[in-house]
Amino acid sequence: MSWQAYVDDHLMCDIEGHEGHRLTAAAIVGHDGSVWAQSATFPQFKPEEMNGIMTDFNEPGHLAPTGLHLGGTKYMVIQGEAGAVIRGKKGSGGITIKKTGQAVVCGIYEEPVTPGQCNMVVERLGDYLIEQGL
């Protein structure tokens, strides 16, 4: 399966039990900041934004004072899982980022999608990739 198929079929799909509800944007990005695959709607990000995200995985709390920035959008960092998941909130939407062995899986959402639904979609794929050694 191509990386693009993972984004299209596992991240940008309808959320279970909620036909028509899906993430706004999603991507799989290597730890080095290279985009493996992304939805057409995923924001163009700056290298320093991805560097900040990777630093927060290695030093949990790094982004808390400044917020998480991606594609010029600032998200308030909320409870995640140290070294594994970063979650951010902006208005009625937000972002979930799950770290795997070689990449990060990113999902961005807006209402009516809930934070929990975004977490489920992103973390499920991230856990699968970890199981596959990726």
Curated annotation (Swiss-Prot):
Pfam families in the record: Profilin
Subcellular location: Cytoplasm, Cytoskeleton
Cross-referenced InterPro entries: PFN, PFN_euk, PFN_sf, Profilin_CS
Key word Cell inner membrane present: no
Sequence motif Involved in PIP2 interaction, residues: 84-100
An example Gene Ontology molecular-function term: actin monomer binding
Posttranslational mods: Phosphorylated by MAP kinases.
Main subcellular location of this protein, as a coarse class: cytoplasm
UniProt entry keywords in alphabetical sequence: Actin-binding, Allergen, Cytoplasm, Cytoskeleton, Disulfide bond, Phosphoprotein
Positions carrying Phosphothreonine: 114
Record PROSITE patterns: PROFILIN
Top-level taxon of the source organism: Eukaryota
Cellular component per GO, a single term: cell cortex
Cystine pairings recorded for this chain: 13-118
Other comment: The variability of the residues taking part of IgE-binding epitopes might be responsible of the difference in cross-reactivity among olive pollen cultivars, and between distantly related pollen species, leading to a variable range of allergy reactions among atopic patients.
Subunit structure: Occurs in many kinds of cells as a complex with monomeric actin in a 1:1 ratio.
Family: Belongs to the profilin family.
Record function comment: Binds to actin and affects the structure of the cytoskeleton. At high concentrations, profilin prevents the polymerization of actin, whereas it enhances it at low concentrations.
Protein name from the UniProt record: Profilin-2
Organism: Olea europaea
